[in-house]
A protein has these predicted regions:
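Charged, amphipathic alpha-helical segments and their flanking helix caps
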Residues: 1-23, 45-148
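Amphipathic, interaction-prone secondary-structure segments
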Residues: 29-52
Length: 148
């Protein structure tokens, strides 16, 4: 699996994400439909960080992850903030995850060396009415190496 597929799988397998019923999508979600409890994983681009004398390349990719949640009362919003905090702690402890990338038509092995998550916040109220559900965002950065 490449780095994008791997991040989707990490989120799908995360016990904190059980309530989303495997509704985790890449570059899509039905914004504001709290009945669906969707999550959208949006890759924001990959940057080459460095290379070494052996030909290994270090990259960094950022993601925005959006999740629909109910937010009727302060209790719900506090619970949502706690969810984002727990997800941040969960993701930040992950490392050394094997990946495979297709580079110029050739399959290359690699490893995720670090995942950093943060900036979890209430992103939008899609319908304009907080009682219809809201969308939260968390940002994820992934550092990884592709071996020659």
């Amino acid at each position: 699996m490449n780095v994008i597929e791997t991040i989707k799988k990490i989120l799908t397998d995360c016990p904190l994400m059980d309530e989303f019923n495997n509704n985790i999508h890449i570059d899509y979600m039905s914004l504001g439909d709290v009945k669906e409890m969707d999550t959208g994983v949006y890759p924001l681009g990959t940057s080459l960080v460095s290379g070494d004398i052996l030909g290994n390349k270090k990259y960094h990719i950022n993601f925005s992850v959006f999740a629909d949640r109910k937010a009727y009362e302060d209790y719900d919003r506090l619970n949502n903030s706690g969810f984002l905090l727990s997800l941040t702690y969960y993701l930040n402890q992950l490392k050394d995850i094997a990946i495979t990338e297709n580079v110029n038509g050739e399959e290359k092995n690699g490893v995720i060396t670090k995942i950093s998550a943060g900036n979890g916040l209430l992103f939008s109220v899609p319908s304009g009415d907080i009682n219809d559900g809201v969308t939260y965002q968390i940002q994820i950065g992934v550092s990884y190496t592709i071996f020659k």
